[in-house]
């Protein structure tokens, strides 16, 4: 291969081959962070608990949601706080808020696996949208191929929601291939399908 240099819009790019697929796109930056094209979830949203919880659990969840929301108003780039806020919103039965929070987390950190796994579960178990569940589980595995628990969750989705044993088996095999030394749980599940 030969080294090539091309100039695209005043930017010099070096690479190998004919570089016909090279593309440069502008990225909007504000406060040294890429601008996300997803609206910030409403951090002042009313806390409405619809889940069956005892009073103490309700108080704890409410306090955690208020605290996390307050922290996120100061630093909306904190992935961990978005992930935990989504968990608390889901716990109280506010699935739409959990979805918004995890979609935002996925937008600000498109290479993380946790928010996509959480969305997969949310869409499968609570929002009853199998296409969105599959899409998010697929992205979670793409982003976190060594996270065994995601393969397990995706397997459960295929087996119990989609009733598709072939896809359930295929996702286990994919996880085993990607993680030969750490996939004993997946191997046992695969044996149970035989």
Regions found by a protein language model. Give the residues of each.
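Residue-level recognition of tetratricopeptide repeat
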Residues: 78, 87, 112, 121-122, 147, 156-157, 182-183, 192
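Canonical tetratricopeptide repeat
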Residues: 84, 118, 153-154, 188-189
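Structural marker of alpha-solenoid helical repeat scaffolds
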Residues: 74-75, 108-109, 143-144, 178-179
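Long, contiguous interaction/recruitment modules in multidomain scaffold/adaptor proteins
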Residues: 1-73
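Structural signature of tandem alpha-helical TPR/SEL1-like repeats
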Residues: 57-70, 92-104, 127-139, 162-174
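TPR alpha-solenoid repeat register
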Residues: 81, 115, 149-150, 185-186
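Extracytoplasmic/luminal low-complexity segments enriched in Pro/Gly and acidic/polar residues
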Residues: 102, 169-175, 183-194
């Amino acid at each position: 291969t030969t080294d090539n240099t091309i100039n695209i819009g005043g930017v010099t790019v070096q690479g190998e081959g004919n570089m016909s697929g090279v593309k440069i796109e502008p990225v909007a930056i504000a406060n040294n962070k890429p601008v996300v094209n997803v609206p910030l979830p409403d951090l002042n949203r009313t806390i409405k608990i619809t889940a069956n919880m005892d009073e103490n659990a309700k108080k704890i969840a409410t306090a955690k949601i208020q605290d996390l929301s307050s922290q996120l108003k100061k630093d909306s780039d904190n992935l961990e706080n978005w992930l935990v806020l989504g968990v608390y919103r889901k716990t109280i039965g506010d699935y739409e808020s959990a979805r918004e929070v995890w979609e935002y987390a996925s937008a600000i950190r498109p290479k993380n696996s946790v928010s996509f796994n959480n969305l997969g579960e949310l869409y499968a178990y609570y929002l009853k949208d199998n296409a969105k569940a599959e899409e998010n589980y697929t992205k979670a595995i793409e982003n976190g191929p060594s996270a065994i628990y995601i393969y397990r969750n995706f397997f459960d989705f295929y087996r119990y929601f989609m009733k598709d044993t072939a896809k359930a088996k295929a996702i286990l095999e994919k996880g085993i291939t990607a993680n030969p030394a750490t996939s004993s749980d997946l191997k046992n599940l695969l044996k149970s399908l035989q």
